[in-house]
Amino acid sequence: SGQYSFGL
């Protein structure tokens, strides 16, 4: 929990 990931 508390993990955020994103891809551009």
UniProtKB/Swiss-Prot annotation:
Superkingdom in the source lineage = Eukaryota
Name the GO cellular-component terms: extracellular region
Localization: Secreted
Spell out the protein name for this chain. Answer: Carcinustatin-17
Classification from the root reads: Eukaryota, Metazoa, Ecdysozoa, Arthropoda, Crustacea
**Which Cys pairs are S-S linked?**
none
Task: Write out the entry's keywords from A to Z.
Answer: Amidation, Neuropeptide, Secreted
Q: What does this protein do?
A: May act as a neurotransmitter or neuromodulator.
Which species does this protein come from?
Answer: Carcinus maenas (Common shore crab)
What is the similarity comment for this entry?
Answer: Belongs to the allatostatin family.
- On this chain, the residues bearing Leucine amide are L8
Which GO BP terms sit in this record?
A: neuropeptide signaling pathway
